[in-house]
């Protein structure tokens, strides 16, 4: 299995040894690769180093939409340098977050987020790397910017949590939907009803660790080793065997991120 989106630094990793420890725990649960994702410039530097420390780790770099105010000319130049690294496999996470403005001190305003999102879209197109989207309560805004700018060849909706209408739009566009532990939450009714509409060939699985720990460990700290719980919940919703879902989503991740051959 491939954890298509995680945050090893937020899980407590600091150096090569602590990265290896997290990845070894994941490997023992059948997770053979992880994509660790940046949310600011400091973490973009860190995830790139982490991907050099262990061959099972890959990186994605961008500024999180809530931090879009920090996208200065200097930040753009550094992100362009980092995204060219061969171990960086995606531009992300970027997008639009309409939940935090007004709730989180220092959160970028929506118009600033839109401008930063457009820049990251262009970066993904220029580099040929997948675009990894953070969308929180912003379906219409995300679609508006993607349509205005033109989507890259590969688009990944990280931690997809929208309804059936948004799922159909994304599927019809050929985008990938990455599902987290949220699919195991009985309270996530709209998402769980939307999942059967998603072709498994367009699905990825992720932990978004240390957040969104899947059932039955909800409320505890999440790590990449918890990914099989999400795979089992997803398998139940699409009426497939967990082993089959693991195989297909691993193949999807390999293709999307250009990971090459690896064990499922």
From Swiss-Prot:
Chain residues that bind a divalent metal cation 2: 93, 134, 158
Superkingdom in the source lineage: Bacteria
Molecular-function annotations in GO: DNA nuclease activity; metal ion binding
Free-text cofactor note: Binds 2 divalent metal cations per subunit.
PROSITE patterns found in the cross-reference section: TATD_1, TATD_3
GO CC, alphabetical: cytosol; plasma membrane
Record: residues binding a divalent metal cation 1: 5, 7, 93, 208
InterPro entries in alphabetical order: DNase_TatD-rel_CS, Metal_Hydrolase, TatD-like, TatD/YcfH-like
Gene disruption: observed consequences: Not essential for growth.
Reported cofactor(s): a divalent metal cation
Gene3D superfamilies the record matches: Metal-dependent hydrolases
Keyword terms, alphabetized: Hydrolase, Metal-binding
Enzymatic class: hydrolase
EC number: 3.1.-.-
Family: Belongs to the metallo-dependent hydrolases superfamily. TatD-type hydrolase family.
NCBIfam families linked to this entry: YchF/TatD family DNA exonuclease (TIGR00010)
The name this protein goes by in its record: Uncharacterized metal-dependent hydrolase TatD
Species for this entry: Mycobacterium tuberculosis (strain ATCC 25618 / H37Rv)
Gene: tatD
């Amino acid at each position: 299995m491939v954890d298509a989106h995680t945050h090893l630094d937020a899980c407590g990793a600091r150096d090569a040894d602590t990265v290896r420890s997290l990845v070894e725990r994941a490997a023992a649960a059948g997770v053979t690769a992880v994509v660790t994702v940046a949310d600011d410039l400091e973490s973009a530097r860190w995830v790139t180093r982490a991907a050099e420390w262990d061959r099972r780790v890959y990186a994605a770099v961008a500024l999180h939409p809530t931090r879009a105010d920090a996208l200065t000319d200097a930040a753009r130049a550094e992100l362009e340098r980092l995204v060219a690294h061969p171990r960086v496999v995606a531009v992300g996470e970027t997008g639009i977050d309409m939940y935090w403005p007004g709730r989180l001190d220092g959160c970028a305003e929506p118009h600033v987020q839109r401008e930063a999102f457009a820049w990251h879209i262009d970066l993904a197109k220029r580099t040929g790397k997948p675009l990894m989207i953070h969308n929180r309560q912003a379906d219409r805004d995300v679609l508006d910017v993607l349509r205005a700018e033109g989507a890259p060849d590969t688009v990944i909706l990280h931690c997809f949590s929208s309804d059936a209408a948004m799922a159909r739009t994304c599927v019809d566009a050929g985008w990938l939907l990455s599902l987290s532990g949220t699919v195991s939450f009985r309270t996530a009714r709209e998402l769980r009803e939307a999942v059967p509409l998603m072709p498994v060939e367009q699905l990825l699985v992720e932990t978004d660790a240390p957040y969104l720990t899947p059932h039955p460990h909800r409320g505890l700290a999440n790590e990449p080793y918890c990914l099989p719980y999400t795979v089992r919940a997803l398998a139940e919703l699409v009426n497939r065997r967990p082993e089959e879902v693991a195989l297909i989503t691993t193949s999807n991740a390999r293709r999307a991120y250009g990971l090459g051959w690896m064990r499922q």
